[in-house]
Amino acid sequence: MGRKWANIVAKKTAKDGATSKVYAKFGVEIYVAAKQGEPDPELNTALKFVIDRAKQAQVPKHVIDKAIDKAKGNTDETFVEGRYEGFGPNGSMIIVDTLTSNVNRTAANVRTAYGKNGGNMGASGSVSYLFDKKGVIVFAGDDADSVFEQLLEADVDVDDVEAEEGTITVYTAPTDLHKGIQALRDNGVEEFQVTELEMIPQSEVVLEGDDLETFEKLIDALESDDDVQKVYHNVADL
């Protein structure tokens, strides 16, 4: 699973990097985190978390600094979080998380993306109850038992630790993600491939042929929207 999460980040960065969409999206996240607290990541855990994620996605330092500088200014631009749930072909389910300065625009864009690409937007809660919110931490290593013990000693609410192909994947309670990251740092982990809050499907579906092609186009349409921050789904191997 660790390889899966690392591959997701790599694919998204490669796909979005050409148009700098990933930079813009992280810029908004960094701005919001800095605006809501101190603009210093050493004094603002939420800001440090976003910056770490941005670095994992290869966001340049100047983009990060620009977003923080903007938050230090007198701008009063307000962003609102949103969630849109829906369905794709053949049992596929999707959760879209947004961060926007114009809710009406975003809602219309997401609904259009669903409708024009073989999907249907559902009501709030129609999909999310079939997903579990968890913290996901991925880093190089192979001793899952040792990592599990370290996290327990640090009183981290850890669900599971997996080792695969030289990669450790840790699943924590969402409230303990930051605590888990710090515990691992305290035990010598210096570099993380993934540190994310994820919505993980309780079961997955396999799509093939036209269904898979339709689903991929739907996901691309949703992720290409500037206001969409994260897209979660239950399709295996994607």
Swiss-Prot record:
Picking any one GO molecular function of the record gives: DNA binding
One Gene Ontology term of the biological-process aspect is: regulation of DNA-templated transcription
Question: Pfam families in the record, alphabetically?
Answer: TACO1_YebC_N, Transcrip_reg
State where it is primarily located: cytoplasm
Can the keyword Zinc-finger be found in this entry's annotation? Answer: no
The record's InterPro entries line, in alphabetical order, gives: Integrase-like_N (IPR017856), TACO1_YebC-like_2nd/3rd_dom (IPR048300), TACO1_YebC_N (IPR049083), Transcrip_reg_TACO1-like (IPR002876), Transcrip_reg_TACO1-like_dom3 (IPR026564), Transcrip_reg_TACO1_YeeN (IPR026562), YebC-like (IPR029072)
SUPFAM superfamilies (alphabetical) = YebC-like
The UniProt entry's coiled-coil ranges are: none
Localization of this protein: Cytoplasm
Q: Which GO terms describe its cellular component?
A: cytosol
Q: Which UniProt keywords apply?
A: Cytoplasm, DNA-binding, Transcription, Transcription regulation
- Entry-linked Gene3D superfamilies: 1.10.10.200, 3.30.70.980
**Which family does the entry's similarity section mention?**
Belongs to the TACO1 family. YeeN subfamily.
Q: Which NCBIfam families match?
A: PRK00110.1, PRK12378.1, YebC/PmpR family DNA-binding transcriptional regulator
Q: What is the protein name stated in its UniProt record? A: Probable transcriptional regulatory protein M6_Spy0297
